[in-house]
């Protein structure tokens, strides 16, 4: 491991009087700025990722709703297809709110889309 004095390509910031935090992780978010992950819109998801990053979120788990399998597969493909760069929070997983739920505790989830197994 090199010492700080040996590193030639570095930028030093004066953080005196400031609080320095690691990037935050958002593990449950359906969307932001008028976009929803379940819309399966690549541009919308990229906008969400940029918004999250601009607010200190560096790692992100977009959350899906209980939907038919075909729709879920399309939504998950969106997460695979979205272009992520340094302006975006990084997708580190997907939070599936359904379809694997107890129908007795389904809340707002549509029962016909809850998987039996």
Region roles according to the model:
Residues 77-117:
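Metal-coordinating catalytic core of metallo-dependent amide/deamination hydrolases
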Residues 1-21:
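Histidine-rich, glycine-flanked metal-binding segment
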């Amino acid at each position: 491991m090199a010492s700080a004095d040996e590193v030639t390509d570095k930028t030093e910031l004066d953080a005196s009087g400031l609080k320095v935090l690691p990037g935050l992780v958002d593990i449950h978010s359906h969307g932001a700025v008028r976009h929803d992950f379940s819309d399966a819109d690549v541009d919308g998801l990229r906008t969400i990722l940029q918004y999250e990053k601009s607010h200190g979120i560096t790692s992100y788990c977009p959350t899906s709703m209980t939907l038919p399998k075909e729709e879920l597969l399309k939504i998950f493909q969106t997460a695979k297809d979205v272009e992520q760069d340094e302006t975006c929070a990084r997708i580190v997983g997907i939070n599936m709110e359904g379809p694997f739920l107890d129908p007795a505790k389904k809340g707002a989830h549509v029962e016909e889309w809850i998987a039996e197994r």
